[in-house]
Amino acid sequence: MEPYSFEASADLASIREGYLANGVVVIRNAIDAARLEAFRETTRKVVYARARSAGIDLADGLPLDEAFNRMCAVDRALGGSVYNCLRTHPEAVKLIPDRVIVRYIEALLGTTDVYYAIDQVHFRIDRRNEERFSLPWHQDYWWNNTTRNAVTMWLPLVDVPQELGPIRFLLGSHKRVAKIRVDPMFKVKWDQNRLFELAEPVQDDLGVDIPVSAGDVVFLHALVMHRSGINRSERNRWSFLTRYADMFDPQFVAKGWKSGIRMGYLSILETDPECVVNRGEIVEPEQATTA
């Protein structure tokens, strides 16, 4: 078995050792099948409700992918509202503090004082030929920015073999904050998909793809370099993720627990200005109006 892959029954010390070495671990079969099915069924109901509210007549009993794709064929924007709902639907909210997840978070962070980054909960629906929504090589810290040792939990709701585009990781790359460029227009025109880009190239073929099955859970370090996989199949890649940090990490406490991003604000400019190589190029709103 790969050094980053563990069964749910593995001892926590070994899991932590693998995590600290690689910046990522996969816990196989961590979530039971019944719970996953409940998550998927709630998801399917949300898709049906949104489609029908828009006057789209979906036949009863369609598989989740088919229902979602038919809705998006009429109006792709409806998929965005499904995403926004699913970020905080009941099955997601119940999972965030569940011991089935948090026992691993505590081991990886080395503390029981866990901060739940509720504003960093996401639901992804990655489809074929929609690479514009995929993220290139990045560190979650740029967006999350709670602490440098924060942990992301990524849960696939479906099997993610090679053709569905598993996440690609640069193992052991979690030792420093990478040099980045920020979108110099972020205070004027907010585009979350282009906020950050690496200032230093990554050799793509050094990355390791980590295929996963529904029920596996991936835990990744805030600084580990990774990128979205490209979905080349006809099936959709459904996944849920959230983030955690040490509540009493000195860096986090010193900034009053401020974190993340919001329109017109990137906290990494306050915490790690030396890592933003183009910070002198940022355009202020008043500059844009007088240009």
What are these regions (language model features)?
Residues 24, 148-152, 164, 207-209, ...:
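Extracellular structured ligand-interaction cores
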Residues 114, 139-146, 155-166, 172-174:
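Active-site region of the double-stranded beta-helix
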Residues 162-225:
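Double-stranded beta-helix
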Residues 145-162, 211-214, 219, 243-247:
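Short, conserved beta-strand element in jelly-roll/cupin
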Residues 5, 49, 53-58, 73, ...:
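Non-heme Fe(II)/2-oxoglutarate
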